[in-house]
Amino acid sequence: VPDYTQAISQFVVDSPTSYHAAQAVAARLEKRGFKAVDETVAWDSSIPARGYVIRDGAIAAWCLPSAPSERTGFRIVGAHTDSPALKLKPQGAIVREGWEMINAEIYGGALENSWLDREVGLAGRLTTYDGAVHLVRTGPIARTAQVAPHLDRSAHENLHLDRQAHMLPLTALAGEAVSCHDIENYLCEQAGISPDQLAFHDVFTYLVQPPSVFGLHQEFLASSRLDNLSSVHAGLVALENLAGTENDAAVFVAFDHEEVGSGTRSGAGGPFLQDVLHGLAAVMGFVGDGERALLARSSCISADAGHSVHPNYGQLHDPQVRPLINHGPLLKINARQRYATDAVGGAIWKRACKAAGVPTQDFVSNNSVPCGTTIGPITASRLGITTVDVGIALLSMHSAREMCGVEDGPYLARALHAYWAEN
């Protein structure tokens, strides 16, 4: 557990944005012999049995079976690389009351008050006119300052945050020659490119405070981006430790843009996974109706963080089903299919946990508190394959700094490994 906690903490530090996360996954996989594949060229029999492909902030990796047969299917683990944050707008510097601020908008369902009074950096990707993509990351340069109660007595009872008026981070005292491009110019300097080369950017705030273990028994981990780097890291560890597969193809995919609906070229609602599976099916010799049958023999575990019962808000949870941190990953169920789990998928998950010797817990919502959704229903409906939704339990989901248990990440990694390795 200490080694795993140290590893996921470093993974979070290395992954301030989805683009960095995809590269961090690739770097780890290459150390285990996985080879990069270019999706802009036709795939043929030269595609490596252990390979990966990156599309923007998403990555898909695979381990093909040594002996494909008429029983072969895909065993897929899906997660997502993005988290709520503030995203830099064009002309990203704005002046207010003698302060230089970052002109930003909210990305995803951020718990907005959690971003107040925290030092943040900027990270993401810059594109230049020659088509090159440059990852960039700054140190702590900004802070969204909360108003003092002496100036707003109502803040104690009813904190209201207007996204335009109250959420912009400050970066400096404004000088006489402030340009609306000051932030972009600074990012170019950090990336080592000339500002006149910059064409566009996808840049987000990220919390510079590193993860930390805490608690009376050092059993909790506080960190940014646990939703959903906790699942990405568990899937990565499971794939790193997979020696090989005999019959089924193991596929790991970490999508981007789940927090904003998944409807992009690198999101679960786009064709990324379908494109990868189509290419791998052809490489294994499954074409035409053979590919359809291959998908019919396949399954998917959608791994996305869920909720532990909250000690201060117990009434918001189901009165009977009360999952806790460090008691095993969650099997997520919803009658409206906001989670994709059904009886068949639930059995797949329970069998993997049993094989791994891992405890698992059920999660359902209070009937009066509708739940969110995941990539699970999107994947199931796009591909027509059995899909089950799981994930570790968190408190403070969508906060700038969430918390989980140090036991649950290793549990999830072991269960995912068993799902791939089970004969």
Regions found by a protein language model. Give the residues of each.
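N-terminal hydrophobic/helix-forming segments and targeting peptides
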Residues: 1-423
